[in-house]
Amino acid sequence: MCGICGIVGHQPASPIAFEALRRLEYRGYDSAGIATLTASGDIERRRAAGKLDNLEHVLKEHPLPGTTGIGHTRWATHGAPTENNAHPHEAGRVAIVHNGIIENFAELKKELEAKGRVFRTETDSETVAHLVDDYLGQGLEPREAAFAAIKRLEGAYAIAMIFKDHEGLLIGARHGAPLAVGYGNGEMFLGSDSIALAPMARKMTYLEDGDWCELTPDHVTIFDMTGAEVSRPVQDLTFMAGQVGKDGYRHYMEKELHEHPVAIGQTLKRITDPASKRIALPEMPFDPAQVPRITITACGSAYYAGMVGRYWLESLARIPVEIDVASEMRYREPPQPDKGVALLISQSGETADTLGVLRSLKKAGQSIVSVLNVEHSTMGRESDLVLGMDAGPEISVASTKAFTAQLSVLAALAIDFARARGTMDQAREERLTASLLDLPSRAAEVFTRTKDIQAMAAVVAQARDVLYLGRGICTPIAFEGALKLKEISYIHAEAYAAGELKHGPISLIDQTVPVVAIAPSTILFDKTLSNLQEAKARGGRILAFTDAEGAKRLEGVAEQVVIMPDVDAFVAPILYAIPVQMLAYEVALLKGTDVDQPRNLAKSVTVE
């Protein structure tokens, strides 16, 4: 959600911090700010509500000097998105930036106000600055004051601090929110993730929960919550800064939509053997044949990927699967079987609710398998096995290529489990694997249908409400389509299994409601067709994604059809996800919304 950065070195800190904040825009924000130490040792800061362009204007009018600094993009949780509530927050001799929620801030604030401290914002984060400054006032040095303060914080936080009269010193801390150290040449950095650090550093360390660190231009010292010095792995950054550019596209989302074929292909390359047409996943830390049940949990689009994964695992591997959104699973505490497996899905590997479920299921004795795009994330480090995607950085808030990469991994996992459990022979495995390996070329074909999708978008863009329908394994793709439309076009959309139409949603259908159908000509096509005829009879405008055979049978029913490449029904959900995402993008263009940074949304939801 919020993005933070810190710089300590010998170059001007403000421009570096600003560019880091640019790269953190994808996380979602509503205000931003930077603070630096001047040559005289004073703290100066600049803040602005709204987009980074507003902060850039302020910085041009009033530049910030100094080689030590911190920056922040804020996604409001406590207090309105105003300049006054924007970070960095300053109290006496310290300035801080914070990502997370301080759950005991009210108690700490009351204590500090009793000492005469005056709070100037509505945020929980300002409490951290006052608490650190209070300890500085008691004679503690910055490192000691920071440690004393963070030991009293409850909740989730990633924090960076600078101190008056201490140029060349930067302190960071994390608990429940991501923070990484970047190593430069005579300079050190803090950042919410590797994307923030990529241009400045080529090596990095992810801090672990409870870690805090002291950075100078030439040295990094990491401590745990006992105050003991600890060592954490140093790793190369996995991508270069150029990978997060738009490369001539209008939006990151447009670029990432066009990267579907590559993301699918690179992901499959890691987990298949093209020569033998067989799946080649890493060795499992358990015997798949002995697993009594799989529990899948995720949030947002990753949850819909999990829904498709459930279909595959149940039908191919004949294994019971439970699935729930992480925010519910975390507090539901269902009984878990011995030798059970928890399958968690996350693009970032930092999703707060999913991470909470991971820890509770691990405590319950479940083996943890995570499907991640960022393998060295917190979830990756805490999992028993990581099935990594290779989708590359995804910057637009609305997930696109990561979704199809997740589906590709889940399809391979289902085949792997089926082989191990004896529910699939080699011939069928080879056929299904071949259909997966054919996907990148089929995905590339989808973009030749752009004009048809744009024509469909012209209808959807005029609507206030849109209904998405799917059947069987394509039902989750209807949910994905409705979510994308809501996220980036701000048009209300709902998705249903087509068979549920008569159980309520049909009462909403009239000539103002487009009905978007995900309808490949599988064995369930006849039933979907019947439901679409019912919707058309009530005045609904039928828009369909189908194949050539389906298009013939939809003549006279569908107003518009996007004819998809013919593929095996097994991989249809992966392929059909692409045009429903493209439809949302084209509608958003017509509506003139902020495609990459839709209002109120954040890319990486690192707080509950």
Curated annotation (Swiss-Prot):
InterPro entries: GATase_2_dom, GFAT, GFAT_N, GlmS/AgaS_SIS, GlmS/FrlB_SIS, Ntn_hydrolases_N, SIS_dom, SIS_dom_sf. It is found in: Cytoplasm. It is an enzyme of class 2 (transferase). GO terms for molecular function: carbohydrate derivative binding; glutamine-fructose-6-phosphate transaminase (isomerizing) activity. Residues 2-218 form the Glutamine amidotransferase type-2 domain. The active site is at residues 2, 603. The keyword Lipid metabolism does not apply. Its EC number is 2.6.1.16. The keyword Cytoplasm applies. One of its GO terms (biological process) is carbohydrate metabolic process. Pfam families: GATase_6, SIS. Keywords: Aminotransferase, Cytoplasm, Glutamine amidotransferase, Repeat, Transferase. GO terms for cellular component: cytosol. Its main location: cytoplasm. It catalyses: D-fructose 6-phosphate + L-glutamine = D-glucosamine 6-phosphate + L-glutamate. It comes from the Bacteria. Coiled coil: none annotated. Gene3D superfamilies: Glucose-6-phosphate isomerase like protein, domain 1, Glutamine Phosphoribosylpyrophosphate, subunit 1, domain 1. Residues 284-423, 456-598 form the SIS domain. Catalyzes the first step in hexosamine metabolism, converting fructose-6P into glucosamine-6P using glutamine as a nitrogen source. NCBIfam families: glmS, PRK00331.1. PANTHER family: GLUCOSAMINE--FRUCTOSE-6-PHOSPHATE AMINOTRANSFERASE, ISOMERIZING (PTHR10937), GLUTAMINE--FRUCTOSE-6-PHOSPHATE TRANSAMINASE (ISOMERIZING) (PTHR10937:SF0). Homodimer. This is Glutamine--fructose-6-phosphate aminotransferase [isomerizing]. The gene is glmS.
